[in-house]
């Protein structure tokens, strides 16, 4: 219960922000845990560090007492509950998700190729035609003047999420977060299938850093982990090197550095 309590404490500032604003549109408070510009950032940072350390201590204690979960299903259910809490935490440590939305929106709603045109460029040339809160948010993003640096599979995911959202930024961020939660749970299961031990699923599934990066900041590394695990599963459990390479190719289609694992698969 302590892990859930400290998780809720981390989410409370976001709940207050959403209660006051009613939307994520216009969100631009980064590296300020309390999400309140009237409170000194040192106080805000101290609050986060204290809660995060306490959460990490409880996390290490749970790992030590791994037998508190009777089976893998019980463990994954617990991970899902924790992820559901972090679903409501705003991405205050990174603005990347709004960049994902922007390049997805360029593709899905405006038929533009974000590998050739930036969010900033398209918006400046067509601002009088745009009535879109996702683009309004994305144009002010730190990466708005950068073309897509991710692989094509990443872009397909961005495009599908924004297509579903129909220009609604709140639906869009929930869609991205919900998908990352599902991927995180699938990763937990794959780790168990590969290792046969709950402890490794526990170490990954409740890792505070992974939850912050994957569920709160909604980074697409969750998909890299998924396809890498599928690649390892096919190689180690199914002895199928062809499918292993295919899934590694999918991981590379998210972030290009994944190709660096190919020599190890071939050598194996």
Which stretches of residues belong to each language-model region?
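Intramembrane catalytic core of multi-pass membrane enzymes that act on lipidic substrates
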Residues: 71-175
């Amino acid at each position: 219960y302590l892990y859930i309590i400290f998780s809720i404490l981390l989410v409370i500032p976001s709940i207050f922000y959403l209660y006051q604003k009613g939307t994520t549109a216009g969100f631009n408070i980064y590296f300020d845990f309390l999400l309140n510009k009237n409170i000194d950032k040192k106080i805000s940072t101290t609050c986060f560090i204290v809660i995060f350390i306490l959460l990490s201590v409880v996390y290490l204690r749970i790992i030590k007492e791994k037998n508190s979960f009777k089976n893998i299903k019980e463990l994954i259910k617990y991970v899902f509950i924790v992820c559901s809490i972090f679903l409501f935490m705003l991405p205050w440590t990174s603005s990347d998700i709004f960049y994902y939305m922007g390049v997805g929106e360029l593709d899905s709603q405006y038929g533009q190729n974000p590998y050739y045109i930036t969010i900033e460029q398209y918006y400046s040339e067509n601002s009088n035609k745009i009535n879109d809160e996702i683009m309004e948010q994305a144009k002010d993003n730190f990466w708005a003047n950068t073309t897509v640096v991710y692989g094509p599979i990443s872009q397909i995911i961005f495009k599908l999420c924004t297509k579903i959202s129909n220009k609604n930024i709140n639906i869009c961020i929930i869609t991205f977060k919900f998908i990352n939660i599902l991927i995180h749970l699938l990763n937990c299961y794959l780790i168990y299938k590969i290792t046969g031990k709950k402890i490794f699923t526990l170490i990954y599934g409740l890792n505070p850093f992974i939850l912050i990066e994957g569920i709160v900041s909604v980074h697409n590394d969750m998909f890299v982990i998924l396809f890498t695990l599928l690649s390892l599963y096919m190689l180690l459990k199914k002895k199928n090197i062809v499918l292993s390479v295919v899934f590694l190719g999918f991981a590379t289609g998210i972030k290009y550095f994944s190709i660096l694992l190919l020599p190890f698969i071939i050598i194996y």
